[in-house]
Curated annotation (Swiss-Prot):
Catalytic residue list: C167 (for beta-ketoacyl synthase activity), H307 (for beta-ketoacyl synthase activity), H344 (for beta-ketoacyl synthase activity)
Any Gene Ontology CC annotation: cytosol
Identification of the protein by name: 3-oxoacyl-[acyl-carrier-protein] synthase 2
GO-annotated molecular function: 3-oxoacyl-[acyl-carrier-protein] synthase activity
InterPro entries: 3-oxoacyl-ACP_synth-2, Beta-ketoacyl_synthase, Ketoacyl_synth_AS, Ketoacyl_synth_C, Ketoacyl_synth_N, PKS_Beta-ketoAc_synthase_dom, Thiolase-like
Higher taxonomy: Bacteria, Bacillati, Cyanobacteriota, Cyanophyceae, Synechococcales
Catalytic function, reaction form: a fatty acyl-[ACP] + malonyl-[ACP] + H(+) = a 3-oxoacyl-[ACP] + holo-[ACP] + CO2; (9Z)-hexadecenoyl-[ACP] + malonyl-[ACP] + H(+) = 3-oxo-(11Z)-octadecenoyl-[ACP] + holo-[ACP] + CO2
SUPFAM superfamilies: Thiolase-like
Chain's gene name: fabF
Keywords: Acyltransferase, Fatty acid biosynthesis, Fatty acid metabolism, Lipid biosynthesis, Lipid metabolism, Transferase
Length: 416
């Protein structure tokens, strides 16, 4: 039941399946090393595609957490979500049982959902007829199954939902889960984002929209946020999951606490289906409102995990928004884009980037922006170029923006 007294919300578990590592430890180590997860596409024949590279998850085995029969009935985006959620639950040492199952929920966002199964079943429909289509096609395809299957796998019977807000979906899921715990609707939420959109149709569509990088001769340097020579984003895949828990619950069971979530805001540009409003006013409001929600002042911010897609429009617009929201203090903080290493996971990006943001607070280190070799004069902040950095991180923000004009900012701080 809802409680009028707002609860403090802490992060007690993290899980990550990414192009640079399939566990939290490997992912964080990869970020600290500046590991590059981009390479030629191996999941399908991309020889006729305008873009032929991406950030694939490597050496991933869904049967580590799922039996083979279950795994066959799930799309890859659900594999990532269910397995990353199991990692996070294990990390939190949170036992779900008959006594607490109703108080633990799931909220996982995705921008697209099961696109691969849709493509495969469309081919079967055209080649063999409707009677040969799989009875599992619909539950494998629909976006909410990442949350649904995670709940089934873990036995979590509390609030359950799915956000589908393009590239802001993972961050919206975390923010909405934060509100549920903060307002007493759940003791803990398993939340984040997932995506598996490295497919022929996805690449064809994003390439036609001129959103992707076409640097086929040099994929390792294609994702270059805030660099003058950037030419589009690089597709990635994977999932990042957080366990958000009521502080009293976490303390009662002696849980490890990575940090505290303190603010969330979302706005809309109401401007264009794909392009951000050039003056960045929508993103500016999201950043400012998240700080207001948290009760923190701009000068308290140490680090921002930027949306930083490596597209010509986003990086300049986001830089403007950060400066407009934080004033002159924007020049005193570290801002980095981990998409330079992982590529852009679309709806999954908010999940893995929130994980990185929380780890920056816990470890007092910030990830770099790799491939930033020729800075854009309009992008004039400290983007932590090239190498990770030791930095006392007391307050950190994570930005996510999506097609449709969605803007989301999450605010975290050290637990004290």
């Amino acid at each position: 039941m809802a409680n009028l007294e707002k609860k403090r919300v802490v992060v007690t578990g993290l899980g990550a399946i990414t192009p640079i590592g399939n566990t939290l430890q490997d992912y964080w180590q990869g970020l600290m090393e500046g590991r590059n997860g981009i390479g030629p596409i191996t999941r399908f024949d991309a020889s006729d595609q305008a873009c032929r590279f991406g950030g694939e998850v490597k050496d991933f085995d869904a049967t580590q957490f799922l039996d083979r029969k279950e795994a066959k009935r799930m799309d890859r985006f659900c594999h990532f979500a269910v397995c990353a959620s199991q990692q996070a639950i294990n990390d939190a040492k949170l036992v779900i049982n008959e006594l607490n199952a109703d108080e633990i929920g799931v909220l996982i966002g995705t921008g697209i959902g099961g696109l691969k199964v849709l493509e495969d079943q469309q081919t079967i429909l055209l080649d063999k007829g409707p009677s040969r289509c799989s009875p599992f096609m619909i539950p494998m395809m629909i976006a909410n199954m990442a949350s649904g299957l995670t709940a089934i796998n873990l036995g979590a019977k509390g609030p359950n939902n799915c956000t589908v807000t393009a590239c802001a979906a993972g961050s919206n899921a975390i923010g909405d889960a934060f509100r549920l715990v903060q307002n007493g609707y759940a003791k803990a939420m398993i939340c984040g984002g997932t995506e598996a959109a490295i497919t022929p149709l996805s690449y064809a569509g994003f390439a036609s929209a001129r959103a992707l990088s076409f640097r086929n001769d040099d994929p390792l340097h294609a994702s270059r946020p805030f660099d003058k020579d950037r030419d589009g984003f690089v597709m990635g895949e994977g999932s990042g999951i957080l366990i958000l828990e009521e502080l009293e619950s976490a303390l009662a069971r002696g849980a490890k606490i990575y940090g505290e979530m303190v603010g969330y805001a979302m706005t809309c540009d109401a401007y264009h289906i794909t392009a951000p409003v050039p003056d960045g006013r929508g993103a500016t409001r999201a950043i400012a409102w998240a700080l207001k929600d948290s009760g923190l002042k701009p000068e308290m911010v140490s680090y921002i995990n930027a949306h930083g897609t490596s597209t010509p429009a986003n990086d300049v617009t986001e830089t403007r928004a950060i400066k407009q929201a934080l004033g002159n203090h924007a020049y005193n903080i570290a801002v980095s884009s981990t998409k330079s290493m992982t590529g852009h996971l679309l709806g999954g990006s908010g999940g893995i980037e929130a994980v990185a943001t929380v780890m920056a607070i816990a470890e007092d280190k910030v990830p770099p922006t790799i491939n930033l070799e020729n800075p854009d004069p309009e992008c004039d902040l400290d983007y932590v170029p090239g190498q990770s950095r030791a930095l006392i991180v007391d307050v950190a923000l994570s930005n996510s923006f999506g097609f449709g004009g969605h803007n989301v900012t999450l605010a975290f701080k050290k637990y004290q």
